[in-house]
Regions:
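Structural register within alpha-helical repeat arrays
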Residues: 51-56, 85-90, 120, 161-162
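Intrinsic-disorder/low-complexity signal
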Residues: 165-264
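TPR/TPR-like (Sel1-like) alpha-helical repeat modules
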Residues: 108, 125, 130-149, 163
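Canonical positions in the second alpha-helix
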Residues: 38, 71-72, 105-106, 140
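Generic helix N-cap/helix-start motif at coil->alpha-helix transitions
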Residues: 9-14, 42-49, 62, 76-83, ...
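Alpha-helical junction/boundary sensor with strong preference for TPR arrays
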Residues: 38-42, 76, 110, 144-148, ...
Length: 264
């Protein structure tokens, strides 16, 4: 297919609306007073806490910014969809230790979901706990977590992530119990690996990948075109898809995403 124009990006009409309100404040004290005034009304709105935290950080008070950010976890302690979003933002801010704690909490709340284990393993890697990460991966491949119906939906990603973990940290790892196919790995040609994650099984969207030659392909995550896939996600508990772009060469790729969720 030939690419002619971009599809519209995922639209969120509430995007940064709280940030704009805080910008009207003249100093940090006013920002914090406004935050306290609005906090209770936004207790279940993680975006409010994150935007408030970001704005406070711009004033140079990192401790207060972190405290506000952590408030978003406290007020949404059992909502997995919101906790996933907060964990994404924590990783984005390179607060990997907090992201790990959130993913561990999600694992406690959703021990039957396949991605709960994968997310914890990846979070362990990001804080340098490579053996702990390997232990989780081994548990997946050795079928230790019998409470999970299946890990087939995340096998592609955990296979890539486990290989990378071992190749980079082999000398530091105890490989006892690791499946034999991971014991004699060799570095292979680099592929562009893109992983998309979302925080709700009901999210409907369309991805469009455009290569430097303006050729494109699409991937739909909608009930009308991919119902069996979405059923599998709910059954196994995963919210992600991995794409490997072979022969990527040089030049710019464009990735568009269009929101297909109704009533948003």
């Amino acid at each position: 297919n030939d690419y002619k124009e971009e599809v519209s990006l995922m639209n969120n009409s509430a995007n940064l609306k709280h940030y704009a309100v805080f910008k009207a404040c003249k100093n940090l004290e006013e920002v914090y007073v406004l935050y306290l005034t609005k906090r209770d009304d936004n207790a279940n709105n993680a975006q409010f806490f994150i935007e408030a935290s970001d704005y406070v950080a711009q004033w140079g008070d990192e401790k207060l910014a972190l405290r506000i950010f952590l408030n978003s976890i406290e007020t949404n302690a059992t909502d997995v969809s919101i906790l996933k979003y907060i964990a994404y933002k924590a990783s984005e801010k390179e607060k990997h230790a907090y992201a790990l704690k959130i993913y561990q909490k999600i694992l406690q709340l959703k021990p039957k979901e396949a991605q709960s284990y994968r997310d914890v393993a990846l979070a362990y890697q990001k804080v340098g706990k490579h053996q702990r990460a390997l232990d989780v991966y081994n548990g997946i491949f050795n079928k230790t977590y019998s409470n999970v119906p299946s890990f087939s939906g995340v096998y592609k990603s955990i296979n890539s992530e486990m290989k990378k973990l071992i190749l980079k940290n082999r000398s530091q790892l105890d490989l006892v119990g690791t499946p034999s196919r991971f014991l004699h790995l060799k570095s292979s040609s680099t592929q562009a690996r893109i992983v998309f994650e979302w925080n709700s099984n009901d999210a409907e969207f369309e991805l469009q990948f455009v290569n430097p030659q303006k050729k494109f392909f699409k991937w739909n995550h909608t009930k009308s075109e991919n119902a069996s896939r979405m059923f599998k996600e709910k059954e196994q508990g995963f919210y992600m898809e991995e794409f490997l772009l072979d022969g990527i060469g040089t030049g710019e790729w464009i990735i568009n995403i269009e929101n297909k969720t109704r009533n948003m």
